[in-house]
């Protein structure tokens, strides 16, 4: 299976109830040889509308912050643990996560990143694969809402940028 075939499967997925309230599944995007993969919770309304991950307010904030520290969005692979928008953007339920995990594992195996950045608490459910470094950062939507979290988020992105420069 190719990445394009995987994306096509995600786009029309009906493995859990979330497809009923979504326009389509939202696959990840970025280079297939990215050193860094970002994994978020699930797509929001903007992402559902256009079928692309992290293009709403939180995604724009993430992209801007990464660029401030020398990380270009075009150089990272970005996806979500769950591939459909959820009602009222609630946290995904365990069976929804389980339905999407094979997609995420396949994405990880295709990209083979050196580092996986887990955005927010829900992304902690990302399976661990030997040989890959995992790091947790505050979700950009929380960083946008709370000053203390914004400062911590920026510090975490700065630390990530430093690690990338050392590799």
What are these regions (language model features)?
Residues 1-167:
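A polyanion-binding, active-site-adjacent surface
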């Amino acid at each position: 299976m190719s990445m394009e075939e995987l994306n096509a499967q995600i786009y029309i997925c009906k493995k859990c109830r979330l497809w009923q309230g979504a326009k389509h599944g939202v696959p990840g995007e970025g280079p297939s040889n990215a050193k860094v993969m970002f994994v978020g919770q699930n797509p929001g309304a903007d992402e559902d509308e256009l079928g692309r991950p992290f293009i709403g307010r939180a995604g724009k904030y993430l992209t801007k912050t990464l660029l401030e520290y020398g990380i270009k969005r075009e150089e990272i692979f970005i996806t979500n643990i769950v591939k459909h928008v959820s009602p009222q953007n609630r946290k995904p339920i365990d069976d929804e996560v389980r339905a999407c995990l094979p997609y995420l594992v396949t994405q990880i195996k295709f990209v083979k990143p050196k580092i996986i950045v887990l955005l927010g608490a829900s992304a902690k459910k990302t399976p661990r694969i030997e040989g890959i470094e995992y790091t947790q950062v505050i979700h950009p939507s929380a960083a946008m809402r709370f000053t203390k979290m914004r400062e911590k988020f920026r510090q975490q992105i700065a630390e990530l940028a430093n690690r990338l420069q050392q590799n």
